[in-house]
């Protein structure tokens, strides 16, 4: 069978249907070229407070399109990444609870408990890194994406290397799709 190589330019939305179509074709080798210039909602707040961070939501959304929903592990991971806080939570309060592993179910979807032990540990570690970095701010987490906070933690842990953060974030999902960041950080 001949393999067709398809490259798709995309941002955070608008390409879900076509991505899902291509990943279900056995004769397609898909590459996603993703721009990361989103600056709305939690992404905008994170970009404002973490210098050099591009839009994590553009990658998070595309990763969620690639998740194999026939796998319980991946389905639970998607729920964790896509979770949005629906009430006011101070960054400092969230930090203290994550740090002490108290009341996690009050803040994080229960699906995190069904992930492999190492994945759960990594996610909580990345969350702790991003929240610790942001805890001096007055950020309120209402409508924040948990996946964006996880990505921000990876970015900070990897010494603000966005492309390495993309690679590390991709390691959470099972995919054959090649993902390339085509964004440039601000040059000024």
Give the ranges of each region predicted by the language model.
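Glycine-rich Rossmann-fold phosphate-binding loop(s) that bind the pyrophosphate
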Residues: 10-11
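Short, conserved loop/helix-junction motifs that constitute active-site signature segments
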Residues: 23-28
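Electropositive, gly/pro-rich neighborhoods at or near active sites that engage anionic ligands
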Residues: 37-188
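Short glycine/serine/threonine-rich phosphate/pyrophosphate-binding segments
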Residues: 14-19
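Short internal beta-strands
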Residues: 30-37
């Amino acid at each position: 069978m001949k393999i067709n190589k398809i490259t798709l330019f995309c941002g955070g939305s608008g390409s879900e249907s076509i991505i899902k179509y291509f990943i279900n074709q056995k004769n397609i080798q898909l590459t996603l070229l993703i721009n990361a210039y989103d600056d709305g909602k939690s992404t905008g707040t994170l970009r404002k407070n973490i210098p050099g961070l591009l839009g994590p939501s553009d990658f998070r959304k595309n990763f969620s399109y690639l998740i194999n929903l026939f796998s319980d592990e991946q389905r639970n991971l998607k729920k964790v990444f896509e979770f949005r806080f629906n009430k006011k939570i101070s960054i400092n309060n969230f930090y203290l609870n994550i740090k002490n592993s108290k009341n996690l179910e009050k803040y994080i979807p229960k699906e995190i408990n069904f992930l492999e032990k190492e994945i759960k540990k990594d996610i909580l570690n990345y969350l702790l890194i991003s929240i610790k970095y942001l805890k001096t701010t007055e950020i309120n987490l209402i409508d924040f994406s948990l996946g964006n906070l996880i990505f921000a933690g990876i970015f900070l842990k990897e010494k603000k290397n966005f492309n390495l953060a993309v690679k590390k974030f991709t390691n959470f999902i099972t995919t054959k799709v090649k993902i390339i960041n085509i964004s440039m950080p601000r040059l000024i």
